[in-house]
């Protein structure tokens, strides 16, 4: 339903406020990416999920890793701040796979990357699997910071779901971006990607809590 033309109109309206616009609309033709960029989109997030072609095909039987990488390279050439990322703890994943994930980020020239532990959802075919390791996740984030010192590395939502009060530890490992959900409460149930409590959304209060969290980490909110 959200065609490039409709998305472009939304981007133009949002840009009138002076805010930067980040899109995450999946794989699209080059022409669509170019049009949205012309409309003012600044960034695009398209996670590659895994650099292992066999694991990727098992998770995305109707797509291919090669196509996903091609889209990321197009986004980079069009001048988007390009974000990707991958899950940690997927079935069949190895240390070598994770190393390939990091090298792929370097090859593409990503500006941002989200790295979070895999969390099985009870309504999916992977529901019987175990979650990814939070410790491995933090180590991979640390390696990413060493390999790509200018990369923006968010503390992912999935890591917060699994690690609870320890979620801020990842900032000592190299993460430098905080993301806060502001989805209106009535819409949250339509985007339950993790089996966690949805909670209420209170934007003003949440902003204050976020600023307190950042200050407690001896960072400056901006």
Tell what function each PLM region has.
Residues 2-4, 34-36, 56-59, 95-98, ...:
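Short secondary-structure transition/capping segments
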Residues 106-222:
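Auxiliary Fe-S-binding modules of radical SAM enzymes
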Residues 6-10, 32, 67-72, 97-105, ...:
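A general structural detector for well-ordered alpha-helical segments in enzyme core domains, enriched
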Residues 29-38, 91-106, 160-173:
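Catalytic cores of alpha/beta
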Residues 1-71, 81-88, 111-114:
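Core AdoMet radical
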Residues 68-120:
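Aromatic-anchored, glycine/proline-accented short structural segments
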Residues 2-6, 59-67, 93-97, 129-136, ...:
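Alpha-helix N-cap and loop-to-helix initiation/capping positions
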